Amino acid sequence: MSIKIRLIIMNFLQFAVWGAYLTSMGSYLVNVGLHEHIGMFYAMQGIVSLFMPAVLGIIADRWIPAQKLLSFSHFTAALFMAAAGYYGMTKGAEVDFGTLFTLYSLSVAFYMPTLALSNSVAYTALDKAGLDTIRTFPPIRIFGTIGFILSLIHISEPTRLDVIS
């Protein structure tokens, strides 16, 4: 498989993950009675984005290759998001804000740095393949946006149908 195809798949999946929860989270929080905390959940993404990419960037530059750190970060974020999902499914409408917020915060603390790490991995791979990153990367990156949009449409479709009926 060519490097471009692999990077297209990586970007598609990178942003499909984000689209899967970003736009539907507010509706979920309203449904479980945590509507007054929606802003805190969304703000946490910005807060962790201020320092976690720098921290993991330093780790990637000094000790762990970016590809391995990207994998570790995605896996760890997925574990915490799965734990948050499992917690939400088992508690139903009796979700505790502190527990859900902690699991979500830990998930985004590991997910948000993957945005920069995936770009670093892509640029390094393109350089190693002898390709011009300025010309080659933008058409690859657009598949991240496509992944985000398709994911949010797929996830929000049942919600949209519930509102219509």
Regions found by a protein language model. Name each.
Residues G46-A54, I149:
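Residue-level signature of mid-helix packing/kink "hotspots" within the transmembrane helices
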Residues F12, F80, E94-L115:
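Hydrophobic core of transmembrane alpha-helices in multi-pass small-molecule transporters
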Residues R62-F75:
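Cytoplasmic membrane-interface "Motif A"-like loop-to-helix N-cap segments
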Residues M1-S49:
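Helix-loop boundary and gating motifs at the non-cytosolic
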